[in-house]
Amino acid sequence: MKVLHVLNSRIYSGAEKVVCQIIKSFRGEIEMVYCSPDSDIVRQMLAEQNVTYLPMKNMSVSELRRVIREQKPDLIHAHDMRAGFFSALCCGKIPLVSHIHNNAYDARGLSAKTVGYLLAGFQAKHILWVSQSSFDGYAFHKLFAKKSSVLYNIIDTQQIFDKKAQDSHTYDYDMIYVGRLTYQKDPQRLMRLCARLKQEKPDLNVAIVGTGELLEEAQTLCESLDIQENVHFLGFQSNPIKMVADSKAMILTSRWEGTPMCALEAMALGTPVVSTPSDGMKDLLEDGVSGYLTEDDEQMARDLLKIFADPEHRKYLADNAKRKFESINDADAYKQAIADCYN
């Protein structure tokens, strides 16, 4: 059996990690290949993991049909709505599995995106949703209830600790952010939060790992808030795991989320997570027990300052988060759910 994974992105972040994880978990059992618009970063990360990469000039019907003709897959696994739409246009009689990785705001009402995804929804033999909220949030979800299931993300724990061991550096960050700098992630809010924290902790040390269309805007705001000595924009990092492990806290200020891979990694590593109560995060964290969830910036600052100052409290949160992580991170069940969709 040959499976073609189709993505619309040129980045390497959460959904892209999920796809590589799926491909590696079926290695030796099912042939799988990764197809997306051409990207140097994706090419580099897939080469490191020995994952076959099929770059396209762009996401278009002609390019995707070319790949399908050349590869002759037995099944197409399309990730997120735009890739699902184009895959539905191109797949013909080839079975299609659609996989939605977040609960995007623009999927909640009547829009070109929600209407366009109807084609993929009707064409797909099965639809996987990263959280219950991502399913409930889609405007026309009731039409596809019988062919839908929720599949929360997991991570390869051994791989995480292997990556940690590969980095011999020691880091001294109070707080780390790992992810794209986009509207979804609200990096402007993150900058304002850092400025608030600096008022109480002048030596605040923050790492920002990632790139995105709002990078320059975030950097400009950082300078205008006079926190450029405290906030370090590190760009894309192929292995930020040791940075996460050494940080006192991980921060997420997202407007919406699925099940963030970075949060799962932090939980496994024992780094407390402080987040807005967005979608999948509410399934991962219990406020004040295994991390913090709040929509209020002042409360978020207080929670973070407590984590920075109190090692015992940090350990309490970390231990509870590790227990929660171990209870939900079932790699065998995840793999079986994927196999059931294919079969």
Predicted regions and their residues:
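N-terminal strand-loop element at the rim of the active site
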Residues: 5-59
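A conserved mid-protein helix/loop that constitutes part of the nucleotide-sugar donor-binding site
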Residues: 13-24, 177-196, 213-220, 261-264, ...
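Short His-centered aromatic/hydrophobic patch
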Residues: 78-84, 100
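Acidic anion/phosphate-binding donor-loop and adjacent secondary structure
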Residues: 139, 150-172, 238, 242
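Aromatic "clamp/platform" in nucleotide-sugar-dependent glycosyltransferases that forms part
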Residues: 236, 255
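Short hydrophobic beta-strand element within catalytic cores of glycosyltransferases
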Residues: 272-275
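Conserved acidic donor-binding segment of nucleotide-sugar-dependent glycosyltransferases
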Residues: 287-298, 306-311
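A short, well-ordered alpha-helix in the C-terminal region of glycosyltransferases
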Residues: 313-328, 337-339
